[in-house]
Amino acid sequence: MNLRRLSWRDHAAQQWPYALIAIALWCAMLPLGATRASASATALPAHAEWPESYRGQALRPLALSAVEQHFAAQFPGRIARFAVADGSELVLRDVNRPTRMLHPAADCWRGIGWRIEATRLERDDDALLWRCFDAVKEGQRVRVCERIVDAQGRSFTDTSAWFWAASLQQSQGPWQALTRVEDKS
């Protein structure tokens, strides 16, 4: 059995790859730690009221379903659903920190059994960009459009792009995710 004592220099030469990996992982996590520390500064006021109108049309609050209530209880922000005077629905999600719980609406619709078709980017009458798709289930068709807006008015149509911009502090909150649903049957 050859038990030779390694010099400090030999030991360091063998261990440097592990140290490099540890430093790289630590550096990669720095932006996420900074966001957590600043989350309380961007917290949403608990007393903030939801809007009474959207683009000049009256909003009527709707109750959240049991599934939505369960999700909302764990959500880092607040969620509300409204009937719009034009017959569509509007879901508002206010978020006070970057979270993967704010995910694409298509994931939710797919998860409750709808088939997703024709995903596309669209501009509305005010030239605002939305990510839209058609959801189809048992002969019913709805058009769903979504976007996320930060505190400075910058918008995102891709939740992953929003998440990384928010996590790296390139977008400041609080943020509001808007999801419009129109019946197309």
Language model regions located:
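Cytosolic-side transmembrane helix boundary signature
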Residues: 1-17
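Hydrophobic membrane-insertion alpha-helices, especially the h-region
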Residues: 13-34
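A residue-level signal for conserved active-site and pocket-lining positions in enzyme catalytic cores
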Residues: 26, 57, 178
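Alpha-helical transmembrane signal-anchor/signal-peptide segments
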Residues: 35-55
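Short, solvent-exposed recognition patches
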Residues: 49-166
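Surface-exposed amphipathic alpha-helical segments
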Residues: 164-167, 172-185
